[in-house]
């Protein structure tokens, strides 16, 4: 089983949105060898469900997010692929776990966009724009992991 973790600051906006989108795309593509997680590098929202803006955009596109609560990225977390939303997240991840074993990327490395960081809709309130960025990157990320880990699609 391959473990992928999306990481943002509070684990209530971007990373749970990415987790939910990725789970749905994996299911649609018939890929069952990838388990998706999300984490935050900050402690403010531990145990809380996704932000209302994240919930609304996921509901709009009929993407389930049941049972999701904010979790902290820990030094002993063991993920094969760690997908950060921005450079600050990358820096925090490396500080939390300087001996990181998994592959670390920024999500937009898998997009065709000029931007390198997914902006935090907690501050911008642009949940629709973030949804589009995340969704457009997930299929390319899946393609990369399937090839890199030599997985099969149905």
Curated annotation (Swiss-Prot):
<dbReference type="InterPro" id="IPR036196">
    <property type="entry name" value="Ptyr_pPase_sf"/>
</dbReference>
<feature type="active site" description="Nucleophile">
    <location>
        <position position="8"/>
    </location>
</feature>
<protein>
    <recommendedName>
        <fullName>Low molecular weight protein-tyrosine-phosphatase PtpA</fullName>
        <ecNumber>3.1.3.48</ecNumber>
    </recommendedName>
</protein>
<feature type="active site" description="Proton donor">
    <location>
        <position position="120"/>
    </location>
</feature>
<feature type="active site">
    <location>
        <position position="14"/>
    </location>
</feature>
<dbReference type="InterPro" id="IPR017867">
    <property type="entry name" value="Tyr_phospatase_low_mol_wt"/>
</dbReference>
<dbReference type="InterPro" id="IPR023485">
    <property type="entry name" value="Ptyr_pPase"/>
</dbReference>
<keyword id="KW-0378">Hydrolase</keyword>
<dbReference type="Pfam" id="PF01451">
    <property type="entry name" value="LMWPc"/>
</dbReference>
<comment type="function">
    <text>Dephosphorylates the phosphotyrosine-containing proteins.</text>
</comment>
<dbReference type="InterPro" id="IPR050438">
    <property type="entry name" value="LMW_PTPase"/>
</dbReference>
<dbReference type="GO" id="GO:0004725">
    <property type="term" value="F:protein tyrosine phosphatase activity"/>
</dbReference>
<comment type="similarity">
    <text>Belongs to the low molecular weight phosphotyrosine protein phosphatase family.</text>
</comment>
<keyword id="KW-0904">Protein phosphatase</keyword>
